[in-house]
């Protein structure tokens, strides 16, 4: 068993039984006391005697078990074994030879607490040895202050019925009560050291102070004055020198406050001034020289702060710190000490005032979120420490910005660094943010700076006392705010503290005990902390935590002081002069202010502070009543003699002045920030990647945080993909505008046709969009998609150049398209349909753009952690989506061009003659015409000469063609019935007429036309499903005979011959088509045609002799494909035709499927990737694919997708990724993900009166039986959980309608009243009420 040194050396008298070593005394508990009424194995009694022979009684120190075994206060882990009690006798000198003895009964002697836990004290732990003074008094204590007389080691303690002067002796380390100013004829001392108080009569009236009493002592000439709250609205001033029973120690009473006083303070420079603040939010300043009467009801200066009640008010201190050097010493202090004061309020505001202009505050800081409780000035710098109910202690800079001290960075023992993140060269930031914040975890009621000079604010010590259950005083070094430097343990919670000097600190506690510590003898918290502590990081056991072995320090390196050559002592600016002549009231600050009120006018007497008419604090004096509109001052320069600091023989402070260097601070900070950001990112990436490689859990967490799982967004929220898409559009518009501007400045255009300009603008827009997409996704020139896009742009250029190079007569165009005038209404209908299709297409394109952006982001995330497999997967998905985007954008562009062409043709048609139209085409046929008319419409350049201006001879046949077209009846599409022969006859006549008219013209085809036709052929190959009709028309048209061949080339297979009319048996024009088998289809045999021949399809047909019988048979059998076979009658002679039609339809469907569903289809690809992810167990990739592509491509069944997402949510919850899980549920495309687990919850209701569980099974069975007997099912509506079967009483009713609460219930939080949702809604929303319907005070709803 380990005991303290004094206990081990103490002699134990005979007859007392020592504690056995094997005795388990841990059951006594920490903080329990070993003293008892009888002698036993675990009780000791220790008495210490002084040299005088009189026993110096050390009262029993009983500390309740206020703290648990392990204390986590303020983040500091302190085992109970290391929190060694400060109450021990180690401070006693060894030559006193203390001894211990035990007694059999309880007496007035004190019992000493001894640590008895076996092996509890670490041998390396330094015990507390700083407690040198301690005593217990009989009176209740509430406040403590020191006597500012260096000749008296005195303290002043006050309570409800006690105001005592205590003196402590450093020689015998004792504290004695010298005088009690409340109880007459009392020489009170500690219990057992002096005689007891004489018994007072029961009728003796005891003066009681208020519970918020405060006590302060004066300075300099008023160092014998003690100020204390005699009652809630008065301050009583006592004289320390009048301690006899004859003299009345009361000097005066100051009572002007209308409500209770919370705080007051003496001025350290002008010691005749005292300031007070209270619940009435007023600050009163009193001059003791003018208040010589026993009671004063008028203060010299009254300031209404226009804020909440004042909790604490303090003057700026004026310490005279000495600096010794080789040639002497000099003293210096703050030049503003006599004028500045500050107050803290219930609202949390900190106000700083200047006595020279009290009408307005200098600074107003929002110091705390709750009420501010205390404040204290720094001894020599313009800093204020504040404490509040929010558990924070904040340090604020309240000086002028021009004279602000440089902020020092907290490096915990290292030298200050200019580039540290806490450094701020602009002190204006102090107005909004504190320089330092210490989170104590409990309300801070008292705090005091150590009264020592410190050039660096962070080397200051701050003592803090709390209102909570922590029976201790914490001393913090501002250089290390998380771990206190000293923890001074007391018996009960501390009530106040005061620094006697730099090393000695006193406090009082709720146990009416006065304690004094020498902090130089106290161990630091770091010395008592265990260095080998290891614990688990979290409950799951993922990692360990240990303590860093580098202890650090509590100080910041200060600059060295440079000695000065002067030996003259610098006087303090607030030195008091004893006037020889004149009224003493006219001396000092108050006298100067009173003299400042001149008789001529009211102006501000301070030259550097112009008058400011500002709403806020108001000011009043005894000698002058100011107007309500403006509170200002006036004075003359002659009256400021006492206010001006006395600076005779003043010299510079013995500190080297700082060097001023001009720097571009924003640029320096920006460079530092960028460097640190890049370095930190690099380190973070390296550390994260290395840790994630070794930990699958960390990799999962990283991917869950970084990957994008959904492209679904809210309407008011735009994600990164939407923002990127908008930025792309904006960039495209900028590039387009720049291109147009450049084109206008460099070239001149002659636009004759508005429709052509529109087409050119559309082509330019498409070109810009495609080039921007190529640059955005970094496609090389040899990429497949880039090659296709560039080829498409080149084709559009050649088409635009060829169309711009040829010019033909507008009358020819009007004549060639006059046959489609009857389709105008069908065009309008089709345009409406096209708009809807275009809107759907735009939505699909937007979805693809979002998916491409997400795929790119996810690929970059996998690349950052060197997961190349998944990186390639997302790149593959992105490329596949880009293929789909390319196809959709090309189809949209082609549809836009077609619509523009229709618009141009319709406008040209309206400009011409209004021809009579025949029957309207069916809506399903669109703008279809006969074969010859389609050929003329699609290729008008094939029916004119090469010359730019047609001759008169050429115009005449065209006019005849125009007349013929007027008389020509528009032929509808043929149906697969007996009318097909008539359609073919009419088609033959029309073709012959066109052939004769064109033969006379003798037109030829140029090279450009053939090249353009070849380009059109490439476009037809991209859309093979539109080719059968056109192929039949071209093959049957005899117009091709008039087109000459420029070069002799071999025949080739056309697109139609290869894919649609392929037959293994070949085709002969004389063959009977109706006798062929179903599996044999039509085939044209051109054995000498090369498939790579760059000859137009029109030229290929021009070298072939197309007989009328062949065309007739082909038309009759291809009619079911062109027409609508749904309503065709079935005839016996058309069986062969129907079989051939069925065979062609199957082949056509097969070709469409092959082209529309290639092997690299996105749906196939994503399904394969999904199957691979499920087989390999890649959870993140599986869920990501389901989120993004399930609703688009139907990857798997809905139930499987929901189940996978639900398990993914459970994983997120397991690894505490609750925010990501919430986003997954928010943007999930499916509903009911969690199933029954997420929708259903069991809630148990208990009766408010009896506390039993409400089941109401008996009433339920009773009502069910009654409903079965009567057959009335409405009886079950009476059942509910708004009553209790156990106590037969109803629960709380609605506060408004007083009916039972059966359905949705609302609770008013401030008062707890309940009500129906509709009742509460009507009361607060409809009737705009703010109070509770039950009449509860306060605002219940805002």
Curated annotation (Swiss-Prot):
Span list, region Disordered: 1-39, 559-593, 600-619, 630-651, 736-766, 788-831, 942-962, 1014-1043
Pfam families: WD40, zf-RING_16
Similarity remark: Belongs to the WD repeat RTC1 family.
Entry-linked PANTHER family: GATOR COMPLEX PROTEIN WDR24 (PTHR46200:SF1)
Biased composition annotated in UniProt, kind: Low complexity: 630-644, 815-824
Lineage: Eukaryota, Fungi, Dikarya, Ascomycota, Saccharomycotina
Spans of repeat WD: 207-248, 256-296, 305-342, 367-406, 439-486, 489-527, 844-884, 1130-1170, 1217-1256
SMART domains to which the protein is assigned, alphabetical: WD40
Modified residues (Phosphoserine): 1037, 1081, 1088, 1090, 1124, 1134
InterPro entries: WD40/YVTN_repeat-like_dom_sf, WD40_repeat_CS, WD40_repeat_dom_sf, WD40_rpt, WDR24, WDR59_RTC1-like_RING_Znf, Znf_RING, Znf_RING/FYVE/PHD
Protein name according to UniProt: Restriction of telomere capping protein 1
Residue ranges covered by zinc fingers (RING-type): 1294-1336
Compartments in which it is found: Vacuole
Superkingdom per UniProt: Eukaryota
């Amino acid at each position: 068993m380990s005991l303290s040194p004094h206990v081990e050396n103490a002699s134990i008298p005979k007859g007392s039984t020592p504690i056995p070593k094997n005795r388990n005394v841990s059951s006594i508990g920490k903080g329990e006391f070993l003293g008892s009424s009888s002698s036993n194995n675990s009780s000791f009694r220790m008495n210490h005697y002084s040299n005088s022979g009189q026993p110096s009684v050390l009262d029993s120190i009983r500390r309740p078990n206020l703290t648990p075994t392990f204390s986590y206060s303020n983040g500091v882990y302190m085992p109970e074994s290391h929190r060694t009690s400060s109450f021990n006798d180690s401070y006693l000198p060894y030559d006193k030879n203390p001894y211990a003895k035990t007694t059999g009964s309880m007496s007035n002697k004190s019992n000493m607490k001894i640590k008895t836990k076996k092996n509890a004290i670490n041998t390396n732990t330094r015990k507390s040895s700083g407690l040198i003074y301690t005593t217990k008094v009989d009176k209740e204590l509430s406040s403590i202050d020191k006597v500012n007389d260096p000749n008296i080691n005195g303290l002043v303690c006050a309570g409800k019925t006690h105001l005592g002067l205590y003196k402590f002796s450093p020689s015998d380390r004792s504290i004695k009560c010298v005088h009690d100013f409340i109880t007459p004829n009392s020489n009170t001392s500690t219990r057992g050291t002096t005689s007891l108080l004489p018994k007072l009569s029961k009728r003796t009236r005891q003066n009681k102070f208020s519970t918020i009493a405060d006590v302060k002592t004066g300075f300099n000439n008023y160092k014998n004055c003690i100020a204390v709250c005699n009652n809630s609205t008065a301050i009583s001033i006592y004289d320390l020198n009048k301690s006899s029973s004859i003299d009345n120690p009361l000097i005066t009473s100051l009572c002007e406050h209308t409500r209770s006083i919370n705080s007051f303070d003496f001025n350290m420079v002008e010691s005749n001034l005292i300031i007070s603040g209270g619940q009435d939010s007023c600050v009163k300043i009193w001059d003791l020289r003018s208040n010589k009467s026993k009671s004063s009801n008028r203060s010299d200066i009254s300031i209404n702060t226009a804020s909440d009640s004042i909790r604490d008010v303090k003057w700026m201190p004026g310490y005279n710190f000495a600096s010794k050097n080789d040639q002497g010493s000099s003293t210096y202090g703050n030049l503003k000490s006599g004028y500045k004061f500050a107050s803290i309020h219930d609202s949390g505001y900190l106000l700083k005032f200047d006595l020279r202009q009290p009408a307005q505050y200098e600074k107003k800081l929002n110091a705390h979120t709750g009420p501010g409780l205390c404040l204290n000035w720094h001894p020599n710098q313009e800093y204020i420490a504040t404490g509040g109910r929010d558990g924070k202690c904040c340090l604020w800079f309240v000086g002028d910005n021009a004279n602000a001290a440089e902020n020092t960075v907290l490096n915990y023992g290292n030298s200050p660094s200019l580039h540290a993140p806490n450094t701020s060269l602009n002190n204006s930031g102090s107005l909004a943010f504190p320089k330092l914040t210490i989170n104590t975890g409990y309300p801070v009621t008292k705090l005091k700076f150590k009264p020592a000079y410190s050039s660096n604010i962070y080397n200051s010590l701050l003592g803090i006392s709390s209102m909570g259950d922590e029976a201790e005083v914490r001393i913090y070094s501002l250089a290390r705010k998380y771990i206190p430097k000293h923890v001074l343990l007391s018996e009960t919670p501390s009530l106040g503290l005061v620094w006697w000097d730099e090393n000695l600190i006193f406090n009082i506690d709720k146990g009416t005990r006065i304690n004094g510590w020498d902090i130089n003898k106290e161990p630091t918290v770091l010395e008592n902390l265990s260095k080998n502590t290891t614990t688990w990081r979290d409950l799951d056991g993922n990692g360990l935590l240990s303590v860093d072995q580098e202890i650090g320090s509590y100080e910041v390196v200060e600059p060295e002081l440079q000695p000065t050559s002067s030996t003259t002592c610098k006087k303090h600016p607030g030195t008091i002069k004893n006037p020889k002549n004149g009224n003493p009231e006219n001396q000092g600050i108050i006298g100067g202010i009173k003299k400042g009120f001149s008789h001529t006018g009211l102006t501000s007497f301070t030259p550097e502070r112009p008058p400011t008419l500002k709403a806020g604090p108001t000011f009043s004096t005894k000698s002058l009543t100011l107007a309500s509109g403006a509170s200002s001052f006036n004075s003359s320069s002659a009256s400021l003699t006492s206010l001006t600091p006395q600076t005779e023989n003043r010299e510079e402070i013995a500190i080297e002045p700082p060097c001023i260097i001009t720097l571009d601070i924003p640029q320096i900070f920006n460079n530092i920030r960028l460097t640190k950001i890049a370095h930190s990112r690099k380190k973070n990436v390296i550390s994260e990647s290395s840790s994630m490689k070794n930990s699958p859990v960390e990799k999962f967490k990283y991917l869950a945080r970084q990957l994008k799982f959904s492209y679904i967004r809210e309407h008011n929220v735009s994600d990164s993909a939407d923002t990127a898409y908008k930025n792309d559009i904006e960039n495209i518009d900028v590039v387009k505008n720049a291109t147009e501007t450049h084109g206008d400045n460099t070239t001149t255009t002659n636009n004759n046709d508005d429709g052509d300009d529109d087409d050119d603008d559309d082509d330019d827009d498409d070109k810009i969009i495609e080039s921007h997409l190529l640059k955005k996704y970094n496609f090389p020139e040899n990429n497949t998609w880039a090659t296709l896009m560039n080829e498409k742009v080149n084709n559009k250029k050649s088409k635009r150049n060829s169309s711009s190079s040829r010019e033909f007569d507008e009358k020819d165009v009007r004549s060639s398209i006059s046959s489609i005038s009857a389709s105008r209404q069908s065009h309008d209908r089709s345009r409406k349909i096209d708009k809807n299709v275009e809107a759907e297409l735009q939505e699909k394109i937007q979805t693809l753009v979002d998916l491409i952006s997400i795929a790119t982001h996810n690929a970059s995330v996998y690349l950052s952690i060197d997961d190349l497999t998944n990186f390639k997967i997302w790149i593959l998905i992105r490329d596949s989506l880009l293929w789909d985007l390319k196809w959709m954008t090309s189809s949209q562009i082609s549809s836009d061009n077609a619509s523009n062409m229709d618009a141009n043709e319709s406008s040209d048609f309206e400009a011409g003659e209004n021809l009579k139209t025949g029957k309207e085409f069916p809506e399903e046929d669109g703008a279809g015409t006969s074969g010859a008319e389609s050929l003329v419409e699609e290729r008008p350049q094939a029916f004119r000469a090469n010359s730019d201006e047609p001759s008169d001879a050429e115009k005449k046949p065209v006019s005849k063609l125009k007349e013929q077209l007027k008389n020509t009846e528009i032929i509808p599409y043929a149906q697969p019935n007996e009318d097909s022969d008539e359609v073919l006859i009419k088609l033959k006549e029309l073709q012959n007429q066109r052939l004769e008219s064109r033969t006379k013209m003798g037109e030829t085809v140029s090279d450009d036309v053939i090249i353009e036709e070849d380009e059109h052929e490439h476009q037809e190959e991209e859309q093979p499903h539109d080719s059968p009709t056109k192929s039949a028309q071209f093959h049957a048209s005899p117009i091709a005979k008039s087109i000459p061949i420029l070069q002799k080339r071999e025949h080739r297979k056309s697109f139609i011959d290869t894919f649609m009319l392929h037959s293994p048996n070949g085709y002969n024009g004389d063959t009977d088509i109706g006798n062929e088998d179903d599996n044999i289809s039509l085939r044209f045999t051109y054995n000498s045609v090369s498939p790579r021949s760059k000859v137009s399809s029109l030229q290929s047909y021009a070298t072939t002799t197309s007989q009328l019988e062949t065309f007739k048979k082909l038309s009759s059998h291809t009619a079911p494909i062109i027409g609508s076979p749904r309503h065709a009658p079935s005839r016996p002679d058309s069986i062969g035709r129907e079989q051939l039609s069925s065979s062609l339809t199957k082949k056509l469907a097969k070709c469409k499927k092959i082209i529309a569903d290639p092997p690299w289809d996105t749906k196939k690809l994503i399904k394969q990737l999904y199957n691979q992810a499920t087989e390999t167990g890649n959870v993140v990739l599986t869920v990501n694919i389901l989120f993004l592509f399930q609703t688009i491509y139907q990857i798997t069944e809905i139930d499987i997708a929901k189940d996978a997402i639900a398990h993914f949510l459970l994983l997120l919850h397991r690894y505490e990724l609750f925010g990501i899980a919430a986003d997954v549920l928010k943007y999930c495309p499916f509903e009911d993900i969690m199933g029954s687990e997420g929708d259903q919850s069991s809630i148990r209701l208990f009766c408010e009166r009896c506390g039993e569980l409400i089941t109401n099974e008996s009433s339920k069975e009773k009502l069910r039986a009654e409903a079965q007997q009567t057959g009335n099912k409405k009886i079950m509506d009476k059942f509910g959980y708004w009553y209790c079967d156990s106590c037969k009483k109803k629960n709380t009713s609605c506060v408004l309608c007083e009916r039972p609460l059966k359905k949705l219930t609302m609770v008013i939080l401030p008062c707890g009243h309940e009500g129906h949702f509709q009742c509460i809604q009507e009361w607060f929303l409809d009737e705009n009420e703010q109070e509770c319907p039950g009449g509860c005070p306060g605002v219940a709803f805002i």
